[in-house]
Amino acid sequence: QCNAFNVWRTQLLNSWRKSNYEALVQDFRLPSETEREYSARGGLDNNPYPWGGPYIRNSRGCFLGNFKPLRGRYMEDGGFHTVKTSSYHPNDFGLYCMSGNVAEWTNTAFDETVYDFAFDLAPDYVYHAKIDDSAALHRKVTRGGSWKDIGYYLNNSTRTFEYQYTAKSYIGFRNVMTHLGRVGKELDLENGEEIQSDIQLK
């Protein structure tokens, strides 16, 4: 379903852009596990949570994400299931709910030993399982933790998995697109003027 939505969203946007004589965009897709973790950290490399600190409550005792703080106590954080994404503050990249609310699918295949053989400069591990492959090959990495998870799963570096052919009330997805640079008219932030890039749109 995630990939079908990405195809639909790409076609819809490109159809609109084409009708307005604008350059077509790259395909929407699921992020890799590495991209997802980088985004969740928000530029704060050594902090365990997207909000920056080592705690899951702020100084006033309020929870910083939607998760299960105690056994069976789903309402302790103010949300029984999912909540509006704007219910909690974004991270330093301006992204909401990078931990808690719903865990998120990635495009990365799950393998417990992936860090033993993954290449540092291209750490994504992708396997497109066939229907008759074993269940282990149908596992995809999920990140971020959800409303039903304990605080451990909200950690930026915690990884778990779910089977790619299943749908769960506690797993969602986030679209990403590869950024290739500027195209067309851009705003010169330094001078506040509109500039034209080297690529001319026909």
Language model segments and positions:
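Short, structured beta-strand segments at or near domain termini in extracellular proteins/domains
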Residues: S169-K185
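Short, solvent-exposed mixed-charge patches
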Residues: L201-K202
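Functional-site microenvironments in short loops/helix caps that host divalent-cation chemistry
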Residues: Q1-N156, G184-E186, E190-D198
